[in-house]
Amino acid sequence: DRLRSRGLGDVYKRQVPALIDVQTGKVVNNDYNRLTNYFEVNFREFHGENAPDLYPEELREEIDKLNIWLFHNVNNGVYKTAFARSKEAFWDAYNAFYAALDILEERLGHQRFLFGDYVTDSDVRLYVTLARLDIRYAFQLGHTKQRLIDYKNLWGYARDLYQIPAFKNNTYFKDFANPSNKKAGHLMETFNARFLDEINFDAYWGAPADRAHLSSDPGNKFKIGKR
């Protein structure tokens, strides 16, 4: 009986991201679209000193609009191709995904981050797809129109973000590259599966991004928030 359920976890299937009450073990929120915003606004008093403001009040409406667009065309765009059940659906999703990357490539040609000088919530959302694009999602896209490294601005932008410790320390390339559904003993393993330990991802992603000149505050990537 759903009315007698003790928490969201009793009603819905397990999925991520999810906010867990560590004292009760219950899922208290799994709103993937707004969860980061709750942390940025409602948990502000718990932020550390000099924590960045990823969701500045004056940009929230614009960030919300861009986040919706990013989700439908980029973040979920890859999965639309993967789960397409017809050629028409596949090519619609495929073309929309690469058209979105072209728009972002143009946008990032004249500003360091999506909203100018500082990293925002939108940059975090875009990064998670870019970090997986060449080493994981390319397999789902089939014919790859362009790799991330073929986009001058997007590739530099992705490296600029990666070189922030909070991004780098939470980017697990080996996990991205090694499919979770890999079958043990399968003779036809991917290049990544065969040579994963020999790939120095940091050598590629740690190369200079050369994007500081696009910012009016080149020494800082974050706008510091107020508690």
Predicted feature residues:
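Single conserved hydrophobic/aromatic residue that forms the stacking wall/gate
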Residues: 1-12
